[in-house]
Curated annotation (Swiss-Prot):
<dbReference type="InterPro" id="IPR036769">
    <property type="entry name" value="Ribosomal_uL11_C_sf"/>
</dbReference>
<dbReference type="InterPro" id="IPR036796">
    <property type="entry name" value="Ribosomal_uL11_N_sf"/>
</dbReference>
<keyword id="KW-0488">Methylation</keyword>
<comment type="subunit">
    <text>Part of the ribosomal stalk of the 50S ribosomal subunit. Interacts with L10 and the large rRNA to form the base of the stalk. L10 forms an elongated spine to which L12 dimers bind in a sequential fashion forming a multimeric L10(L12)X complex.</text>
</comment>
<comment type="similarity">
    <text>Belongs to the universal ribosomal protein uL11 family.</text>
</comment>
<keyword id="KW-0699">rRNA-binding</keyword>
<dbReference type="InterPro" id="IPR020785">
    <property type="entry name" value="Ribosomal_uL11_CS"/>
</dbReference>
<dbReference type="GO" id="GO:0003735">
    <property type="term" value="F:structural constituent of ribosome"/>
</dbReference>
<dbReference type="GO" id="GO:0022625">
    <property type="term" value="C:cytosolic large ribosomal subunit"/>
</dbReference>
<keyword id="KW-0687">Ribonucleoprotein</keyword>
<dbReference type="GO" id="GO:0070180">
    <property type="term" value="F:large ribosomal subunit rRNA binding"/>
</dbReference>
<dbReference type="InterPro" id="IPR020784">
    <property type="entry name" value="Ribosomal_uL11_N"/>
</dbReference>
<dbReference type="InterPro" id="IPR020783">
    <property type="entry name" value="Ribosomal_uL11_C"/>
</dbReference>
<keyword id="KW-0689">Ribosomal protein</keyword>
<protein>
    <recommendedName>
        <fullName>Large ribosomal subunit protein uL11</fullName>
    </recommendedName>
</protein>
<dbReference type="InterPro" id="IPR000911">
    <property type="entry name" value="Ribosomal_uL11"/>
</dbReference>
<keyword id="KW-0694">RNA-binding</keyword>
Amino acid sequence: MAKKVQAYVKLQVAAGMANPSPPVGPALGQQGVNIMEFCKAFNARTESLEKGLPIPVVITVYADRSFTFVTKTPPAAVLLKKAAGIKSGSSKPNKDKVGKVTLDQIRQIAETKAADMTGATIETKMKSIEGTARSMGLVVEG
């Protein structure tokens, strides 16, 4: 018989840097989950990724207080900022352009995020990433 699901907890945690402080501690503590067990498992799973990169994670908490979790790919905005070499997007994206990205960089990001995105082809996923880039004030070249 399958375990009874008590809750789903969605968080963004820095790769390799999960610790019991907020946001992890309070979110898991109120569900009765062993926080250190999650932190060790998460850090082990994300040790191959760039340290500090925000990773979305969905934690399934069961009635017996056990848990499983699924890590996703980093948000497109984070990958775009890294590709363009900027700290943050534009506050006025239609007027102020803060950087440039090429179609090759967008294709690479779309391929990285392919598993977490909807869209039949890589081209449709690229269009989605291009839209995110434009809304951040980035110029798409190519």
